[in-house]
Amino acid sequence: MLTANVFVNIPVKSIARAYTYSVPAELSYLEAGWRVFVPFGGRKVEGFIVSVAEKTAEELGDMAGKLKPIEAAVDEEPWFSDKMLQAAQWLADFYLCSLAEMMRLFMPGKSGIKITVIYQSVPEQANHLLLAMPAYRAVYDCLSAGEGLSRGEIGKALPDYKTDLPQILDKLCQYGILSKEYQAGKREKARYEKFAQLLAEVTPELLAEFKRKKAQQHLLEVLSAAEQGQMAFAALKAQKITTATIHNLAEAGLIQIRQRRVLRDSYKDTELTCQPQINLTLDQNKAIEAMTPFLSEGKHHGFLLKGVTGSGKTQVYIEMAKKARAKGRQVVVLVPEIALTGQVVLAFKAYFPDDIVVMHSRLSLSERNDAVVRVRRGGAGIVIGARSALFTPLDNIGLIIMDEEQDMSYKQDESPRYHAKVVAEELAKIHQAVLLLGSATPSLESYYRTQQGELTLLTMPKRIGDMPLPVVQCVDMRQELRMGNRHILSRPLQLLIEQTMAKGQQIIIMLNRRGFSTFVMCRSCGEVIKCKLCALPLVYHKNGKLSCHHCDVTEPVPDVCPKCSSRYIKYFGSGTEKLEQELHQIVPSARVIRMDRDTTNTKFAHQEILQKFREKQYDILLGTQMVAKGHDIPNVTAVGIISADSSLNLPDFRAAERCFMLITQTAGRAGRHGTQGKVIIQTYNPEHYAVTCGIAQDYEGFYEQEMVLRQGLFYPPFSRIVKLLFQHEEENNAKGNAQKLVIAFNEHFAGAKGQQIIGPSPAVIARFRGIYRFVVLIKTTDLPAVQEFLREQQLHLRADVAIDIDPIAML
DNA sequence: ACTAAAGAACTC
DNA sequence: AGTTCTTTAGTG
């Protein structure tokens, strides 16, 4: 019998294994990689075939009689290639998650199908006692009238019973009065456009026949000029040609109205404003020469391109992409945030106008699907986007570029908690592709790996045209306070703003906190108002609401303190909203635009804000760290960083690294075109090496000092970290389970070097929705051994434990 | 995640 | 006893 091993697309750890199905004769063409529709339990779900095998009854053993047949195929071709399956399997093993959970990342949307339940009446039960009730009778009669309807359709037909329809339907199914059927439909919608196709040759004689039908004559002329005599209705409409005219001409048999699929692409009309750089610098050439042999021979290798801001890393990316495309291989270009795709698309479009698709999670499902279709048809070979672009179905990747490789947003912070760098590296290995990590300030991990010889370091230390780096000035905020300035804005920064505006130039100001006030406290009893779900302080926003930046929950500001009923409630700390207000007061003539998560909810909000700023409609761009990333605005000559060190006091071993990178990156935004920029950094820790090295743009200096600390504390890159989060309603159970694991770990690794386990300790959000959370941290030099140990302990199958490999937040 | 079956609580 | 709500096991 022909059988298939199938992983069902259900994200539950306890069923993270293959189930065997029989393959009916009419589906005998199915192979590994196909998405299918299968019966599972009492319902039908999507599944992924991972292998197909001919099996005898003996081989099947006692399962022989229990096999259910695969119902249908979801697509017309296999969705997962062998390489994709291989990558998904490796990643599932590495991150200790289920294969299905990993595989569903390789599709746009979590599932390829939408399953609807269709209810049908059972005729034999027409006189069931339960149907004496009017509501039940109405539903039954409604279904008896026609074919069978979904819940939504019944609700539409019987609006009176809509509210308790679910209960009615459940009940009727329970008694067998109604039957259920599961129907799978495509989730995404293909879009079509109508177009006119010219059938005849347009000769002067033919046009003469339409002397008295001017509109149709015009249409003929337009179509004869068009490519292949085809033109979309939308384009014709733009030329004031009505559908009536088109239909008339179709009646006459001279044209044909047809339909074709259009692939949506909201980046299609990106204007080509980028000037191609013609002469490469010496450094650029060196970098390209180092990588080219590997690309030409189709050999995997990893490179770290360390180039200061303005050294022309993008041009290196483009040159390498050209070479990969010339060999017929595909290219993936990753950026840390969706907002930065526009920038890269712009640069690449100048060289590859039609060879690009954009892929990220803010696109609609259909749009992502259209992008996949374009890639599959060979309509584009360069995928640009955020993390999720890595999972585009590509069969021949030659080059993976990861810009700003140090950026923490490359780590997915929900399950499966993968790091794009790990995925990129594994894909590069499987495809024998070149991996190119780019950064001005590489992560300590990557830089360390170049010293270990695992990656090849390429450097570009000079800015193009040898432009000077900006002048950086540090302002000690303690000093400011002593001088009597209690504003967020120091006087030197205020002065810089005024001077810059006087010259007609622009300023970027970065404050790493959104909202108005960072916490709200009662002055009588000291109670800080906290989120009901996670107990973290709520942030006050100017719209009068308190919001939790962790759970995205908002609530109104209470009139009196919830603890002591005092009316003395005050706002402390400052965010971007408050700074915006203060700027208006201190520099009334300044036109300020704010960019943070609150003002960038829509797909193109980032681009719109930056565009307005670029067009000089505003003087000051004020925002959170997103203003520090990758934008190049010529007229910006000054940058202010409000509290560069706010992260230094966090309980995170990467605090110093974060602070250093924030300063270097933000400072890099100033003065990229001719004029030397000026940067002011406000800090309470002017002596800290992260601040001093940041100001001096001294990566090596920072690296050396930080590495000493990391080694002393056995932190990455000298170890790798695995975070385990234990959750339980009972505090003691959560803690006890964690404790048990710690004991088992110590037993297992007794005497082994390079293994350390810490905890359990309460998580930052110690209690979430009534569930207690404890954290255990493992530091190891032998990650595979730890992964193996966790698998032995069956930890990856437990619903109450979340495993995070290479976590970003420790607690 | 969802279903179906088994068990516990509740109504009459 | 009959019904309804809750818990639990199992999905090929």
Identify the residue ranges that each predicted region occupies:
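C-terminal effector/interaction modules appended to NTPase cores
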Residues: 769-771, 790
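Short amphipathic alpha-helix segments
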Residues: 735-758
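Short amphipathic beta-strand starts and helix->beta connectors
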Residues: 702-711, 750-764
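Short, flexible, solvent-exposed loop/turn segments with mixed acidic/basic and small polar residues
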Residues: 141, 712-716, 763-769
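Short proline/glycine- and acidic-rich turn/helix-capping motifs at secondary-structure junctions
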Residues: 759-769, 802-811
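Generic solvent-exposed, charged/amphipathic alpha-helical segments
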Residues: 89-92, 155, 494, 580, ...
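Accessory, non-ATPase domains that flank or precede helicase/AAA+ motor cores in DNA-metabolism machines
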Residues: 1-383, 388-439, 451-467, 748, ...
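Inter-lobe coupling/hinge segments of SF2-like helicase ATPases
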Residues: 275-281, 285, 289, 298-735, ...
